[in-house]
Curated annotation (Swiss-Prot):
Membrane topology (UniProt): Multi-pass membrane protein
Gene encoding the protein: ATP9
Highest taxon, organism lineage: Eukaryota
Location of this chain's protein in the cell: Mitochondrion membrane
GO molecular function: ATP binding; lipid binding; proton transmembrane transporter activity
Protein keywords: ATP-binding, CF(0), Hydrogen ion transport, Ion transport, Lipid-binding, Membrane, Mitochondrion, Nucleotide-binding, Transmembrane, Transmembrane helix, Transport
GO CC, any one term: proton-transporting two-sector ATPase complex, proton-transporting domain
TM region positions: 8-28, 45-72
Name of the protein described by the UniProt record: ATP synthase subunit 9, mitochondrial
Claim: ATP-binding is one of the keywords in the record: yes
GO biological process, one term: proton motive force-driven ATP synthesis
Matching Gene3D superfamilies: F1F0 ATP synthase subunit C
Description of how the protein assembles with itself and partners: F-type ATPases have 2 components, CF(1) - the catalytic core - and CF(0) - the membrane proton channel. CF(1) has five subunits: alpha(3), beta(3), gamma(1), delta(1), epsilon(1). CF(0) has three main subunits: a, b and c.
Cited SUPFAM superfamilies: F1F0 ATP synthase subunit C
Amino acid sequence: MLEGAKSMGAGAATNASAGAAIGIGNVLSSSIHSVARNPSLAKQLFGYAILGFALTEANASFAPMMAFLISFVFQVR
């Protein structure tokens, strides 16, 4: 029974990648809208977009790490 709960926890941890995909889409769409409104700030906004993408992707990289920890490190007693 605990092995099934462990698998469910690992599966739930991987759902964070869906949230990261939504977040990256929001960052990029906001960047496109901002450049469309003010093209003279395109270089500065590109830097902010890359920063937002990197922070969102960093949060997404924790999801597989947690899934692996749940699956392989935590022992069922």
